[in-house]
Amino acid sequence: MPLKGKHLIDPDQLTFNEIHEIINLGLDMEQNPAKYSKVCEGKILGTMFFEPSTRTRLSFESAMLRMGGTVLGFSDVTTSSVTKGESVADTIRVLDDYADILVMRHPVAGTPREASQYSTVPVINGGDGGHQHPTQTLTDLITIQKYHGEIRGLKVAFCGDLLFGRTVHSLLKTLSRFPDMEFILISPPELPIPEDLKTEVIEKYNVKITETDSLEKHMAEIDILYMTRIQKERFLNQEDYEKLKDSYILTNSLLENAKQDLIILHPLPRVNEIHTEVDRDPRAKYFEQAKMGVYVRMALMALLLGNIEIAAPTLTLKVKNGTIMTKFIAS
């Protein structure tokens, strides 16, 4: 069980086979939840959310409860001893005596990595500033696998705040590891993908990247559209946010020329960037995406705790050309 006892701070820590193991197991957990209802019985998840969260925090809690475990922690930093001046190191040293596995969200990039250095139990990064969000990446991957089939040779468009969007940064890096991927990066000029990240994936994985400020221009060629909100909390100047907040709004009319097997994703929460009329389009999978986040986090925690062995289940998935059997072999 190679994942047992490990921390997950950055998706780069996962091998390609480990990513497949987690996706595999998460899909099987969705199909056969009763089989896993006691897999974490007696285990405690400790949650440390120094920044607001709905989906990530609650999906972690739901994931542990569905496996028979329990949860303790805080979601409001004002109720923790950090407000009294306690250091991250001391907080971690205490909490890892109370819990078997920890998840941390923090507004400062790098803090979960720092926390992992003081913890004797696995630490999962639940999002750190504008840096990384590895479990959202796993959520995105399992959703693509479930609704589009094999992750290979896809044209993926990221649209919105690409500068501060940690979900974009994590997913772009990870998808670049899959075969024959192409990316379209759509953003206002003020919010481009970080140059060092773009350079890294091009040099390391030889992927093709197109940068543009037009969503409409590329709609017909996209396989996966990953919409993101313009993040108000990352702006120091309210006027700058107001200027950019409605840069992109996905509507039914924009989707008229899109592929019929397009998948529309969004890490949520959304503001105005996807009109509610799109929710009824069968290509909109962002609510299903949030649901799949529970199962992939179940899989991750079970593997990090060493409470489960991978049997590499064979799963039947519906894809665009009918029904196929997809099999992954875990290492």
Swiss-Prot record:
GO biological processes: 'de novo' pyrimidine nucleobase biosynthetic process; 'de novo' UMP biosynthetic process; amino acid metabolic process
EC number(s) per entry: 2.1.3.2
Enzyme class at the top of the EC tree: transferase
Gene3D superfamilies in the cross-refs: Aspartate/ornithine carbamoyltransferase
Catalytic function, reaction form: carbamoyl phosphate + L-aspartate = N-carbamoyl-L-aspartate + phosphate + H(+)
Pathway connected to this protein: Pyrimidine metabolism; UMP biosynthesis via de novo pathway; (S)-dihydroorotate from bicarbonate: step 2/3
Alphabetical list of InterPro entries matching this protein: Asp/Orn_carbamoyltranf_P-bd, Asp/Orn_carbamoylTrfase, Asp/Orn_carbamoylTrfase_sf, Asp_carbamoyltransf, Asp_carbamoyltransf_Asp/Orn-bd
Residues binding L-aspartate, per UniProt: K84, R166, R229
Keywords from the UniProt entry: Pyrimidine biosynthesis, Transferase
The UniProt record lists the keyword Ion transport: no
Record: residues binding carbamoyl phosphate: R55, T56, R105, H133, Q136, L268, P269
Assembly with partners or alone: Heterododecamer (2C3:3R2) of six catalytic PyrB chains organized as two trimers (C3), and six regulatory PyrI chains organized as three dimers (R2).
Function: Catalyzes the condensation of carbamoyl phosphate and aspartate to form carbamoyl aspartate and inorganic phosphate, the committed step in the de novo pyrimidine nucleotide biosynthesis pathway.
Family: Belongs to the aspartate/ornithine carbamoyltransferase superfamily. ATCase family.
Name of the protein in its database record: Aspartate carbamoyltransferase catalytic subunit
Organism of this sequence: Alkaliphilus oremlandii (strain OhILAs)
